[in-house]
UniProtKB/Swiss-Prot annotation:
Belongs to the nuclear hormone receptor family. The gene is nhr-31. GO terms for cellular component: nucleus. Residues 79-154 bind DNA. The keyword Transport does not apply. InterPro entries: HNF4-like_DBD, NHR-like_dom_sf, Nucl_hrmn_rcpt_lig-bd, Nuclear_hrmn_rcpt, Orphan_Nuclear_Rcpt, Znf_hrmn_rcpt, Znf_NHR/GATA. A zinc finger (NR C4-type) spans 82-102, 118-142. Residues 66-77 have a biased composition (Polar residues). GO terms for molecular function: DNA-binding transcription factor activity; RNA polymerase II cis-regulatory region sequence-specific DNA binding; zinc ion binding. CDD domains: NR_DBD_HNF4A (cd06960), NR_LBD (cd06157). It is found in: Nucleus. Residues 195-464 form the NR LBD domain. This is Nuclear hormone receptor family member nhr-31.
Length: 583
């Protein structure tokens, strides 16, 4: 038996109802504090005098045989229950009975545009004791309970029309902060080590800056054409390109025009410069010459991977390749594309088949694409790197690879992380092969018309700068190179001055005079290469079952030098008189 000393009770028949949880206390009254004791309706019998003027009245509470009626959505004592977590004192919010906690959570989720993820099987317990354990399941429970997202009005947060607008503080690094907030909302990223998360946020910030470009055109920057700026000038005077970076977009809105291909190639070159400059700041051990070497090494593979990855993201059409100017090129090129060599060697067809199709199957996320870009750029075997730069770049590349493996392991916990990570790295040989085709096409473009376009940036990466100097000092007049078929091979292939042009001959059928006139060495020059490209096949292309003659043979000691001849005409006339023996 439990006796409670209270002051007033409202009577209604033989039953009583508690009107309020608080009571007015009179002097001399003993107060008993009851913490959330469920009140039961019962038969009340007085055990003493019932005078209201007495000091206190004792009541004996006995359970009643009548079962309490509980309405749907309400508790036993008449209070409404939250449809989401089951907490008491719920009111109508966004179409359902909900407590203030779930109402505020639902509103913050929609107005803040958060993105949650469940660490388990999307079936977490959501009650008033564990409702903060999993935000994803709590938000799903709000939707299932019937909360209407359209009922949330963000404009209700404003306190009224402000006569003086509030000044918002400018963030130091807005892109980095956005990625930080987005990654903090993802539960998988919280499992990454701190250093790995920082590196990932840095790479994502670099990608955002490269894609957005800049539109702050100033009069100071318009004085110099960006195409006339060299790679060294880009790294040493960074403000020279401010306002020259157009925004990059891969949405296939229209088909690209042939005259756009050069502009697209130039924009991708600037993007490669920005990527290299930002990554080398993280490495903090690379000078300008090393940066130039990295740009030359990564331009083609980075461009191929960018086009392929964004094509797999933005379209399911298997017959188009998206470019960075909101345009695309089809698999079957129109006839006008034959006028340029940018897309020769079946580059589009092979890229769609060998790279875009596997990327669609892998369905890469942005957190996987960006580290792959960094791995492509950070090539420690790039030609021209110093030994110190190779070591620094190799260390940074190892960190990025380890970060990529951690990301794959957290993003795809159901599948084998090691096999997916291996499939990602197996894309690199295909990218290298396709980038070789692209480099060859760019070499031809620079050889055929690159000098006329005046784009020194692409000419520095794919053209031989010594070619122009040799052309000026050469005795051959420039009109000889107007025919594309007679352009020097030196501009599209490595120097061959140290190679020997040797032809297979049958010693038994050759006289000593023939051997002396043929000569084993043909010094390389621009004029000779041009005439060789015009249609003359050198003797080295002929074959014979006999072995090559020994270089130390006495018959080859008296070779003919190009300087001893009176011009290339006399030299080639002697070569044309020599018989060529075919097998």
């Amino acid at each position: 038996m439990e006796q409670l000393d209270v002051e007033d009770w409202e009577y209604w028949g033989d039953e009583y109802l508690e009107e309020e949880p608080t009571y007015a206390i009179r002097p001399g009254t003993r107060v008993v504090k009851v913490e959330r004791v469920p009140m039961m309706r019962g038969d009340l019998r007085t055990s003493g005098a019932t005078s209201s003027s007495g000091p206190a009245t004792s009541y004996i509470i006995r359970p009643s045989d009548k079962q309490p009626t509980v309405s749907s959505g309400g508790s036993q004592n008449g209070d409404s229950v939250c449809a989401v977590c089951g907490d008491g004192i719920a009111k109508l919010h966004y179409g359902v009975l909900a407590c203030y906690g779930c109402k505020g959570f639902f509103r913050r989720t929609l107005t803040g545009k958060y993105r949650y993820a469940c660490r388990f099987s999307n079936n977490c317990i959501v009650d008033k004791f564990q409702r903060n354990s999993c935000r994803y399941c709590r938000f799903q429970r709000c939707i299932q309970a019937g909360m209407d997202p359209k009922a949330v009005r963000p404009d209700r947060d404003q306190t009224g029309k402000q006569k003086v607008p509030r000044i918002k503080k400018k963030q130091i690094d807005e892109e980095l902060l956005n990625h930080m907030m987005r990654l903090q909302g993802d539960d998988w990223s919280r499992k990454l080590p701190v250093e790995t998360r920082i590196l990932l946020m840095q790479l994502m910030s670099i990608e955002d800056k490269v894609v957005k470009g800049d539109n702050n055109m100033s009069a100071q920057n318009t004085a110099k054409d960006p195409k006339s700026i060299s790679l060294r000038e880009m790294f040493e005077s960074k403000p020279a390109l401010d306002g020259r970076r157009m925004e990059i977009g891969y949405e296939p809105f229209r088909m690209a025009r042939t005259e756009e291909l050069g502009v697209i190639a130039h924009r991708r070159a600037i993007a490669a410069v920005d990527w290299v400059d930002s990554l080398t700041e993280i490495a903090d051990a690379v000078d300008t010459e090393d940066k130039v070497a990295l740009v030359k090494s990564c331009y083609s593979p980075l461009t191929i991977f960018n086009f392929s990855a964004r094509t797999a993201q933005n379209t399911k059409n298997p017959d188009i390749l998206c470019l960075c100017s909101h345009s695309f090129v089809p698999r079957r090129l129109p006839p006008e594309f034959n006028e340029t060599n940018h897309l020769s060697n079946f580059l589009i067809d092979r890229t769609l088949n060998e790279l875009v199709a596997p990327l669609r199957k892998l369905n890469l996320k942005e957190e996987e694409i960006v580290p792959l870009k960094a791995i492509i750029i950070l090539n420690p075997n790039a030609k021209g790197l110093s030994e110190h730069a190779r070591h620094a770049i190799s260390e940074l590349r190892d960190k990025v690879q380890d970060m990529l493996f951690q990301i794959v392991k957290e993003l795809h916990p159901i599948y084998s992380a090691s096999s997916r990570f291996g499939n990602l790295l197996l894309l690199l040989p295909t990218i290298t092969t396709l980038s070789g085709l692209m480099s060859e096409n760019m070499h031809f473009c620079q050889a055929l018309g690159g000098r006329a376009s005046g784009d020194n940036l692409l000419a520095e990466m794919f053209g031989d700068r010594t070619f122009d100097d040799q052309l000026i000092s050469s005795s051959i007049s420039p009109p000889l190179f107007e025919n594309p078929a007679e352009i020097c091979l030196e501009s599209i292939s490595p120097p061959m001055s140290d190679r020997r042009f040797v032809r297979r001959v049958d010693v038994a059928t050759q006289t000593n005079d023939d051997l002396l006139s043929s000569g084993p060495y043909l010094p390389h020059s621009n004029s000779c290469s041009s005439m060789l490209n015009a249609g003359y096949s050198p003797p080295m292309l002929s074959t014979s079952p006999f072995p090559l003659l020994d270089d130390n043979d006495s018959a080859f000691q008296n070779d003919i030098s190009l300087t001893e001849l009176n011009g290339c005409e006399e030299f080639f006339s002697q070569l044309m008189d020599q018989p060529i023996i075919d097998s």
